């Protein structure tokens, strides 16, 4: 009798079905399979958290992970666990989108923590394709900011449902009810549907892991948020019986398995080692590439868990496909149908990376050659599709690197610096476009939050940088929110000036808006540089007279070379300074005269400040230990001749 028992896939099963005896049983199996996968989909939610920088996205994910039981009782819990690299933790920003999953009751919730800075918006646009709804996180004091608008507009265009969470309601300067009005105005302004305007609203303190439906009475945990996700965000609407199809929305790179594709399965089922085909909607002439899914992973808490089979609606990662890019479609060989996707926004800012050729070249770096720098930049493009690296015409030691903004490129520079690379970079420059025969430049929507008595100064400074003043709104009784449309190049070097004008109390944020006709020449900075005229070691005597002419960037005992920028001066002209000048030795000494020389502590320049300070005739020397601003032409006489020739 055991030999007569039907076994799916067993010997003789095909004969059994062809004879008609197993048809009914096979149909029943297929029906049970569909019901089983439909039940799995009903217990699945895909959601992204979007907000502006430092509004608490990663902190909220931390709290969701803790309260869903991801951590063991004896496991050490790290704050902001989703910010996995040192730069993310130090700066308090998320750079690369992260995936995680929690289980609440019997429902699996895939959560994506997206970047909040506009420069990493290339990450956000792709991630929204993977989810069915979003959590819009807004600071109870700052309200919606430019990046909030940028991401929310794309989420609404995709028809996603929105859960509004007002965070940091325990801030002393919170203005909850004004922020609620601002969120509703933003939704109306972005043409949200009636259903989207009726979004549920919760009030939260992510730091304490508490939220509720009323700002006056919030609970002791995040249960209201979990319940709202289950009730309001729809389960994926997909077909598990159709041929396999998945759009690659994100990617990772591992030295052992190579490129890892991440995305949501749109339809069908995928098994380990299954044959697949890669195609692209925007490249229909491309020959489809055949591959094999050698490894499949689901997200579970903070980990990727290897699995044998995955079904439609789930967010997964897979390896085994060598050359794959964001926007590619992975599908079954018998149904090659590429999925449509919006191309990632093009870079707007470019810098030139080249071999360090200063007098101190090679002293501090581990990787200093053009080949090593080129290989590192090319590896970065495998992980960051918003980055573009191209050759510099006529040079074999320089590369043009284009990104979404100054922070995007500064993160790359800082990462390479920490890895031991030594190189030099040019000042950032905007990428111009020709539209209908007219030269156009990228424009930024700038929003600033400033003390009301500083508003006039800020408006005047932005106007001098060819910006347009769009709107002004009060924030309480002492602060104002100003909105501008300004050329991207008009913001180069402005942040330090802005902090000075607002006495350190201003907050500024910008996001790419559009391309507009070129607005003419614009000075990069309004101050001059103090430039070393000799090579050697700086001494107190040489710097003492220099500090009366401006602000120093270095102190005594620092190696300098001719052409190195050692400070700034209020005048627009550069001033040559001999920082190595020593006091002439004589037989006459006044008691205590040497002790009277006191230097003002030098201004410590961060990487972003150095990039903002750079003028067109300067470059930034980057080493693992030091940042040095220098003139392209080091010798003073040659530099003056070059200026006169112009």
What does each model-found stretch correspond to?
Residues 35-138, 142, 182, 251-254:
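P-loop NTPase switch module centered on the Walker A-proximal segment
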Residues 54, 60, 92, 111-113, ...:
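Residue-level signature of catalytic and energy-coupling elements of molecular machines
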Residues 172-230:
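Canonical P-loop GTPase G-domain recognition
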Residues 198-200, 220, 227-231, 258-261, ...:
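Accessory interaction regions appended to the cores of large information-processing enzymes
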